[in-house]
């Protein structure tokens, strides 16, 4: 996962380094004992703070920031000794941003969802049919800001849309 609140560049670079260490271990096996070619696929998703977790107060990054983090991992992957055995995939940053709004949005987001649908957003979980510009236009049309829901740090005293739900764990526990 990329984009956690305490993440450092060293953390990002450690992902491809670990993949390379695994490939190195494979190549330590004598050729006659190996079972096929070594191919390691590493995939990352981007951090989305969720309700009822200690991260519910955390901010998300912008799509550009997430893609920058993926570029660091991808670039480091290409620098590894066993780069031909390594492959890297990452989740779509703009889909992540929308997922963040849906995860922590309030009742006003319902209007934006309906508006996006009426503007042509359909089957948006499929990458080839996802149109971020429809969603941003829908939010703007409803007078809402995606950044309000995602990129701002939330106060420990903020009242969340899900606070009325009793999960058996108090908000104070997460703080």
Model-predicted segments: where are they?
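A broadly tuned preference for mixed-charge, low-complexity surface segments
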Residues: 13, 17, 62-65, 97-105
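Radical SAM enzyme core and accessory elements
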Residues: 79-175
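Conserved C-terminal portion of the radical SAM core fold
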Residues: 1-53, 65-92
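Short His/Asp/Glu-rich catalytic/ion-coordination signatures at enzyme active sites or charged loops
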Residues: 54-55, 158
